[in-house]
Each structure stands twice: as C-alpha cells, then as structure tokens.
UniProtKB/Swiss-Prot annotation:
Gene: mjaIIM
Species this protein is from: Methanocaldococcus jannaschii (strain ATCC 43067 / DSM 2661 / JAL-1 / JCM 10045 / NBRC 100440)
Keyword Ion transport included in the entry's annotation: no
Keyword vocabulary terms for this entry: DNA-binding, Methyltransferase, Restriction system, S-adenosyl-L-methionine, Transferase
Catalytic activity reported: a 2'-deoxycytidine in DNA + S-adenosyl-L-methionine = an N(4)-methyl-2'-deoxycytidine in DNA + S-adenosyl-L-homocysteine + H(+)
UniProt name for this protein: Type II methyltransferase M.MjaII
Length: 530
C-alpha cells in the first residue's frame, strides 16, 4: 500500500498493529484476545489485512465487530437453539492450540480428550496438594498429567494397553541427554534409509502444479468471499479441481510406473496396507525395526509413540477427515480445512523429524515443572479392578492411600455411540501387535445408541462408579465430564448411589470436524450418599 492509499483510508479506518489491537481489545472486552487470535483472523480472511512498509495492520473496528459477534451473537444463537444457558467461562475459546496441548499433553493425538485447562479449573477449586485423584476412564492421561503438574497424586485406569502406553510416556521420568541421543540416532538412520529409496521427481512436479493453482484460484480474496458467503465453496472448488486433474493426470502418466518393490510390507496388516502408500510402509517398517533393537525399555516406549504419531499423520486421507477416516486418498484434493488444494503425505521424514524434536522438547519442558507426586497407571477394567491390590505393589503410595483413601474422581467416560476408542488408533495396534479389547469398551460407536446400547451403557458406567466408591473417602468430590444427550446420567447416578450437587454446561467451540452445530458437554459435580 502506498502513502496516497494510506492517506485515503486513514480517516475512515482505525488501523493498528496486531499487537496494539490485541492490547486495546483485551482491555475493552475484559477477556484476553491474544495476538495469535487476530493473526488467525487475518490468515483466514475473516478480517482485512493492511500492509504498510512491511508491517501488518488491521482495522480495529472490523476486529471489534468480529469479536462482538463471537462473544454476544454466537452465545445468544447457541443458547436459543439449545434452550438453556451455558457456562461460557468454561469454553476456553481463545486458547491457542499450543496452550490446549501444552508440554506432554501434546505428545500424541487422542480423539475425545478434554483440555488440561478444564481439569486445572476444577482441581484448583476443589482439591489440594497431596490429595489423591482417580480417573477410571484415563484415556491418554490428561487428568494424571495435570495432577502431576499441580502436586496431586493420581491413579488412572484404562482398558486399552495403547492408551496406557501414551499416559506412561507422558508421566515417566527420563535421562534427557540419553533420550535425545538415542532418538536422534534413530531419526538419522531412517533419513539415510529413505534417501536411498531415490528422489521422486513426480512429487516435485506435483507440488509445482498445486502451487500454481493455489496462487491463481484459492487466494486470500477467495477466503474472504467464502467468509462473507459470496461464493459457493462446493461448486467453485469442484470446477477448479476438474481443471487441475486434467493436468495432474498427464503428470502421473509421465512419472508414475508400477513399482511393487514394497508391495508385501504389512500385507498381513489390513489397516496399514489399506491406508498407507508402499513407500511410507517401507519407511514405517524400517523405524519399527529400530524400535525392536532399542535396549532401553523407557526410551523404546517413547519411540513407539513417535512412530505412532507419525503414522497417524501420514495416512492416506484428507486434512479435514483426519479424526474420522472415510476412504483412502492418495491424490491431491480440495481441502475444506485449509481452503486450498492439499495432497497426502509422500514420505514420513518431515513428520518423523518434527515429532522426534517435539516429543523431546515436550518431555524436557514437563520435567522442569512436574511436582513430586505419586502416580499409578492400571491397564484393566474399571468395573472390576481392585485398586487396593494394585497399590500394594507400590508400598509408599499404598501407605498414603491407607491413611486417607482417595479424595475424588475427575473423569470423562466414553460418550455413548460417538467414538470407537480402539479403532481410532488401529494403525498403532497393528504396528506394535497390541491386543485389542474392543468388546470391553463401554458405549462404543460400533454398538450404536439403540435402547439396548443405552441399557448396556447405563449398566457399564454404573458398575464403574460403584466399584470406584469402594476406594473413596466419605468426603470425596466427584466430577464427570460427558455429553449426556440421551439423558442417561440421572439413572446412572441413582444406580450408583451418588447425589448431584451441580451441573455445569460447557460450550465446545474448537471441534476437529466440519460439524459446527451448537455442542456442549455437562460437568456433573457429585457426592456420595450419606
């Protein structure tokens, strides 16, 4: 923008740097609006960008109007649709992805986990350092990690061996220098192996073609028109992709030949064989063999998590369906998440390097803030597990338990008919030959939400809570996070002998998939019957 243009717009627009706009709007709304929040709006065309002498400015009124709509109109719209008030303080809607996945919380993706800030919110208000908390539906260990950060002792139970592996890697103590040395050596060996597979000229030419189309057809102006609903995304993208595929087809004919060199790798593992290209299967298999050769069992588990996380990111699928796989995609596609042409990953190297360094960094960061507290991870069925017997294997923790028993529960049971918890990590179970216990899941998606499924769900959750009560002290506080759209929890609490103290209704704004309908979850605060 030249000086004349600047003079023309200055009287009409109040332009500020993103940093200045963040400070002004935070003060105005009494709610922290960070620089990255405004940068996101600029990046995705929600507000205009003004560039003057290589500095980015925004119109403060435009940004303010966006947040007014977000804070007030959206709240009103959601509450009208749902028919009741929501606890917006629990939305944590302006947290960045980095904050929602701080330190070891971000070591491995896990669909259906709550954010650590939600756990922290309730632990700070209802529990003390030295207390013992139990999570009978541990998942990836969010509650246990947050307890460790706050000096609270914790116990987690999960039916899935892989979930227990994720949690264990988050909570273990490490020799950081040894960890770095072994993991970086494994990374470098994999790089050398991949390099010897040969350069892929096809990928280079494909990327050039994608870049050409994105620069011409999926510009910032296109994103702005989308946000203002001035263009039909489906029809426009379909038309452009038809043109793209004509050129792409010629590239494939020129460069791609039938190459069955790696065709037999993972042929006996149906998920891996279906969702990964031959080259990627070869790279995954090479790193897997390095894991098998690793003699340090603690670090071996970290390497397993790095490979699993890498495998998840290099599946042949679209960015907007990463959480719920539909059909394999190995060619470029229009991406509804990024509003441009994207392509599936062609090699594991970029992700493997990124995740190796990221996991090391997260573990090192957590090692500096973790407190001195006990934790216990139990791979078992929460309906029947004897926590006392498990604690006896850890004498110091058991002595603490004997003197006070368990002070509370903070957990999020499976949501009826929404997630298949084993299937979401099918790649990991096959990679590491981990036994699957799908039939022992409570309320999985594959069983649906029929009357029969609801009855089984009520019995399953009730059995867990009844079993847990045996190990709680009489003043224990219980918090359960769930989306109770079938209104099953009143009966569950009656069966379990629990009294509802309060229900919080938390709006969930940052969802993985394209569904943007109003969605909330309940946080039930409970106590035991006297």
């Amino acid at each position: 923008m030249n000086l004349d243009a600047w003079l023309d717009i200055q009287p009409a627009k109040k332009l500020y740097t993103i940093k200045e706009a963040s400070r002004i709007l935070t003060k105005k709304f009494g709610k922290e609006i960070k620089e990255h929040n405004i940068s996101y709006l600029v990046q995705y065309g929600r507000v205009n960008k003004y560039k003057i002498k290589n500095r980015v400015y925004v119109d403060i009124d435009e940004v303010e109007n966006y947040y007014k709509k977000l804070f007030f109109e959206k709240r009103k719209e959601w509450e009208e649709k749902l028919g009741f008030k929501l606890d917006w303080d629990l939305a944590f809607d302006l947290l960045s992805e980095k904050e929602r996945t701080k330190h070891v919380h971000g070591i491995h993706p896990y669909k259906g986990k709550f954010i650590p800030q939600l756990v922290e919110y309730f632990l700070k208000r209802h529990f003390n350092v030295g207390d013992i908390i139990i999570d009978p539906f541990m998942g990836s260990g969010t509650t246990l990690v947050q307890c460790m950060e706050m000096g609270i002792n914790s116990i987690g139970i999960d039916i899935s061996p892989f979930n227990c592996l994720i949690a264990e890697v988050k909570l273990q103590k490490y020799d950081i220098q040894k960890l770095k040395k072994i993991l970086l050596d494994m990374l470098n060996k994999t790089k050398e192996f991949s390099k010897n597979l040969g350069d892929d000229e096809f990928v280079k030419e494909m990327d050039k073609l994608i870049e050409k189309y994105n620069k011409k057809y999926f510009t910032l102006e296109y994103k702005r028109k989308l946000s203002k609903k001035e263009i039909d995304e489906d029809s426009y993208s379909e038309k452009i992709m038809e043109m793209f595929y004509l050129e792409y087809k010629k590239l494939k004919e020129k460069y791609c030949k039938n190459d069955d060199e790696f065709d037999d790798i993972f042929k006996d593992k149906p998920f891996l064989y279906k969702w990964y290209s031959p080259r990627i299967r070869a790279e995954l298999n090479f790193y897997l063999n390095l894991i098998k050769d690793c003699r340090d069992e603690t670090i071996k588990k970290v390497a397993m998590i790095i490979l699993s996380r890498t495998a998840r990111s290099v599946r042949g699928t679209t960015h907007f369906d990463l959480a719920t796989l539909k059909e394999p995609v190995f060619d470029p596609y229009y991406c509804y998440k990024h509003k441009k042409i994207c392509r599936p990953v062609q090699t594991i190297l970029r992700h493997l390097e990124e995740y190796t360094n990221d996991v090391i960094s997260r573990i090192e960061e957590f090692s500096k803030i973790r407190k001195d507290a006990y934790y216990l991870i139990i791979n078992g069925d929460s309906r029947t597990v004897d926590i006392e017997e498990e604690l006896k294997k850890h004498p110091n923790f058991y002595e603490l338990y004997k003197n006070k028993k368990i002070d509370g529960i903070f957990t999020s049971p499976p949501y009826l008919g929404q997630i298949d918890y084993h299937e979401q990590h099918a790649y990991a179970y096959e990679l590491f030959d981990i036994p699957r216990l799908d039939e022992l899941e409570i309320g999985p998606k594959f069983k649906g939400s029929s009357k029969k499924a609801q009855k089984e769900y009520i019995e399953g959750i009730s059995d867990v809570l009844i079993n847990m009560k045996r190990f709680l002290n009489e003043d224990a506080k219980i918090f359960i996070v769930v989306n109770d759209k079938k209104n099953l929890y009143k009966e569950i609490f009656e069966k379990s002998g629990l009294i509802l103290v309060r229900e919080f209704k938390r709006p969930v704004l940052n969802r993985t998939e394209r569904d943007r309908n109003p969605y909330y979850e309940s946080i039930f605060e409970l106590k035991m019957e006297e």
